[in-house]
Amino acid sequence: MSLLTEVETPIRNEWGCRCNDSSDPLVVAASIIGILHLILWILDRLFFKCIYRFFEHGLKRGPSTEGVPESMREEYRKEQQSAVDADDSHFVSIELE
């Protein structure tokens, strides 16, 4: 028998868990957090288009207008547009020659 074979052959005791304190609450908490992180990462990679599309359109919608009279909706739209128009005047256009 060669020396290499003897080195690679595992002893039965080495197959067991060497962590005697695996019931430590910190180890358990770290394991749970690691598993949850892995699950969330997998879900994010699988459904990232749906998730980010929802957030992108959800943030652009603005406040809900249910139960608001049409005249108040129109007034709100005009205020929003005037705020956008006022912000446009702050930009400086630079022309390159």
Curated annotation (Swiss-Prot):
It holds the Pfam family Flu_M2. The chain crosses the membrane at residues 23-43. InterPro entries: Flu_M2. One of its GO terms (cellular component) is virion membrane. A lipid is attached at residue 50 (S-palmitoyl cysteine). Keywords: Disulfide bond, Glycoprotein, Host cell membrane, Host membrane, Host-virus interaction, Hydrogen ion transport, Inhibition of host autophagy by virus, Ion channel, Ion transport, Lipoprotein, Membrane, Palmitate, Phosphoprotein, Signal-anchor, Transmembrane, Transmembrane helix, Transport, Viral ion channel, Virion. Its main location: virion. When the channel is activated, one or more imidazole moieties of His-37 probably become bi-protonated. Cytoplasmic tail plays an important role in virion assembly and morphogenesis. Homotetramer; composed of two disulfide-linked dimers held together by non-covalent interactions. May interact with matrix protein 1. Belongs to the influenza viruses matrix protein M2 family. Forms a proton-selective ion channel that is necessary for the efficient release of the viral genome during virus entry. After attaching to the cell surface, the virion enters the cell by endocytosis. Acidification of the endosome triggers M2 ion channel activity. This is Matrix protein 2. It comes from Influenza A virus (strain A/Udorn/1972 H3N2). The gene is M.
